[in-house]
Amino acid sequence: MKDFTTYLSTAPVLTLVSLTAVAGLLIEINRFFPDALTAAF
């Protein structure tokens, strides 16, 4: 049961960290390529 409560306490933290990383990546992509319609990859 202790392992299950540890999982419940770490899953939201890992979710928050991963969502923050994805949001930061999207912000940086939009900073370097402001208009996605004209970005030539």
Swiss-Prot record:
Q: What this chain does, per the record? A: May help in the organization of the PsaE and PsaF subunits.
The terms describing its cellular component in GO are:
chloroplast thylakoid membrane; photosystem I
Key words, A-Z:
Chloroplast, Membrane, Photosynthesis, Photosystem I, Plastid, Thylakoid, Transmembrane, Transmembrane helix
Name where it's found.
Plastid, Chloroplast thylakoid membrane
Superkingdom of the source species: Eukaryota
HAMAP family, A to Z: PSI_PsaJ (MF_00522)
Protein's name according to its UniProt entry: Photosystem I reaction center subunit IX
Do the record's keywords include Transmembrane helix?
yes
